[in-house]
Amino acid sequence: MLAAKNILNRSSLSSSFRIATRLQSTKVQGSVIGIDLGTTNSAVAIMEGKVPKIIENAEGSRTTPSVVAFTKEGERLVGIPAKRQAVVNPENTLFATKRLIGRRFEDAEVQRDIKQVPYKIVKHSNGDAWVEARGQTYSPAQIGGFVLNKMKETAEAYLGKPVKNAVVTVPAYFNDSQRQATKDAGQIVGLNVLRVVNEPTAAALAYGLEKSDSKVVAVFDLGGGTFDISILDIDNGVFEVKSTNGDTHLGGEDFDIYLLREIVSRFKTETGIDLENDRMAIQRIREAAEKAKIELSSTVSTEINLPFITADASGPKHINMKFSRAQFETLTAPLVKRTVDPVKKALKDAGLSTSDISEVLLVGGMSRMPKVVETVKSLFGKDPSKAVNPDEAVAIGAAVQGAVLSGEVTDVLLLDVTPLSLGIETLGGVFTRLIPRNTTIPTKKSQIFSTAAAGQTSVEIRVFQGERELVRDNKLIGNFTLAGIPPAPKGVPQIEVTFDIDADGIINVSARDKATNKDSSITVAGSSGLSENEIEQMVNDAEKFKSQDEARKQAIETANKADQLANDTENSLKEFEGKVDKAEAQKVRDQITSLKELVARVQGGEEVNAEELKTKTEELQTSSMKLFEQLYKNDSNNNNNNNNGNNAESDETKQ
């Protein structure tokens, strides 16, 4: 455990800085493709001169389903061929696996997905959620890799040459582990992922490439599996993200599931047959639900016809149901409502009101839903822009960023942000922030800390992510130990802790003992990170418990100071024992004992009266000052008496 020790505030060390170099300074050789690795569909684009182009796949489509299937013949299918055979091979057809990237098997979202997909989600030996097909287990990153490879092959077929470098997009609210897993997916198939770019930021790049005027743009990105809202300031080629928010488990897949459940429920009511465990039937209904959802964006009603969905003793059963747009909107209203709070929080974090927003861009297939468009219009007080293609903007933006990295496009600077605050645990379980949420990245920040006990030769650095004042209310994302610190009194060693976040949002934390230059570090990439509920809860709780957290933090900090005062006073009493008034010394000892008991209660997590702690600290401070002032006076008087005696002897000698 570390004891926070801001030595003269260490402003030169603890100020963060933005690496705002023009990105073309790190040029790469050859073409850099841009890939939108989506939950439902993926796309690939390339820059041709100054014009970005979406590349059609082998089937002639501009987007490719993010679906991977394994046939009984041992063949692996990706994209449209995989999706076509899903009904006859549901348990070996993997889709929406992006939602599993970087997640632990025990995560609530994973447990929910287990009940909603026909394939097996299993627990890997490291605790992560993996998938199983044909008796073989795969990491979600591997499945993502197969889709990335399909995008790579699509680009190579068009360009007529091998492709090695890519920019891949991720949801803005992806945590460190999910970003790292996305880079791993590229590496698996031999792609050098030069940059991981947030999806709404990429869409803004696509929108603002040829625009020189200054605008504040909101990107509302509701895709197949995730929702992001980002506020950007676009000014003459500089794209600066002001804030971001979102939900990593909200998208078109959820709308499909809501409609699927309604169909299954109606069918059960009509026939008494529960289709929930019939994987083939559920897959047919899932595909029909997706198709109906899409149709209801352009028509006011649709019909779902699925003949021979099942059979019982009386014969075959069919599904024949009608759904109106109004019914679908009522059914999915809770999902649409979940987009509202993140928008409000993003505006608040950016310090802006809706009147400050120049344009609202709609991105992601679900943003076509009329109710979503209506909600966005209501939130921002203006019609959203149709300047970008919701399905293609992200891949185009990734291609723009790729062209920046290769030097084909100049004078474009992208400044993104980290979505949640980062810091470490300090004495008393306090969350000490080093990098606040919505800090522009890349960024680096250092701060000096010290030991919490005398003779401490190692410290454990525990890295947390969140918005609460105490670590117990935030998310542990990594920890490591710095050993080999020379034994010294409590608070003497100077340990410099540095957070370094790269342009991909991946975190490196290091600690260095300034006396010996020994250091230790960790790249925070092994944890499964935060669920969307945890992120939303963190921000809500941070507001709800702000005063309570602040009071608790103040109590801990006061207790730490009180403990230091008690120890210092106790040591001084021992040093000057016999030179101070015994009664006064005992009074001070009693105050030390009383104060230490109160401090122990605070450090044990007990709620104590902050005023009582403050009063007892001040009383000890006053008593100890009086005692040692008297000691100083006594010493001064003794010195004066000695000097007078010496002067008298000197006078006698002269006579």
Curated annotation (Swiss-Prot):
Organelle transit peptide: 1-23
Keyword field: ATP-binding, Chaperone, Hydrolase, Mitochondrion, Nucleotide-binding, Phosphoprotein, Stress response, Transit peptide
Family affiliation: Belongs to the heat shock protein 70 family.
Role, per record: Essential component of the PAM complex, a complex required for the translocation of transit peptide-containing proteins from the inner membrane into the mitochondrial matrix in an ATP-dependent manner. Constitutes the ATP-driven core of the motor and binds the precursor preprotein. Required for the import of the processed frataxin homolog YFH1 into the mitochondrion. Acts as a non-catalytic component of endonuclease SceI (endo.SceI), which cleaves specifically at multiple sites on mitochondrial DNA and produces double-stranded breaks. SSC1 confers broader sequence specificity, greater stability, and higher activity on the catalytic subunit.
Low complexity bias locations: 637-647
Species of the source: Saccharomyces cerevisiae
Protein name per the record: Import motor subunit, mitochondrial
Location(s), subcellular: Mitochondrion matrix
Keyword Mitochondrion tagged: yes
UniProt-recorded Gene Ontology molecular function terms: ATP binding; ATP-dependent protein folding chaperone; hydrolase activity; unfolded protein binding
PANTHER family xref list: HEAT SHOCK PROTEIN 70KDA
